[in-house]
């Protein structure tokens, strides 16, 4: 019988040795928001608490400066 194994979640920022998450790095921030514009929780992404706080504040700062949208484009 086949068993399904889930991949172990790990914090990419800890593994790469990132000291601070930059709000201008839009490519990285887009990986942590949904299509509708919500911030993805750390239990889904595996991000540690320290970097999840930095990530959420960076996303909010990028939204305020209009680098990221608050919601998806309504068509």
UniProtKB/Swiss-Prot annotation:
One of its GO terms (molecular function) is small ribosomal subunit rRNA binding. This is Small ribosomal subunit protein bS18. It comes from the Bacteria. Belongs to the bacterial ribosomal protein bS18 family. Pfam families: Ribosomal_S18 (PF01084). Gene3D superfamilies: Ribosomal protein S18 (4.10.640.10). The keyword RNA-binding applies. The lineage of its organism: Bacteria, Pseudomonadati, Pseudomonadota, Gammaproteobacteria, Alteromonadales. It comes from Alteromonas mediterranea (strain DSM 17117 / CIP 110805 / LMG 28347 / Deep ecotype). The keyword RNA-binding applies. Binds as a heterodimer with protein bS6 to the central domain of the 16S rRNA, where it helps stabilize the platform of the 30S subunit.
């Amino acid at each position: 019988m086949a068993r399904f194994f889930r991949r172990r979640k790990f914090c990419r920022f800890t593994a790469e040795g990132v000291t601070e998450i930059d709000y201008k790095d839009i490519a990285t921030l887009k990986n942590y928001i949904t299509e509708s514009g919500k911030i993805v929780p750390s239990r889904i992404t595996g991000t540690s608490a320290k970097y999840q706080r930095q990530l959420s504040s960076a996303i909010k700062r990028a939204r305020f400066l209009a680098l990221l949208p608050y919601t998806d484009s309504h068509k």
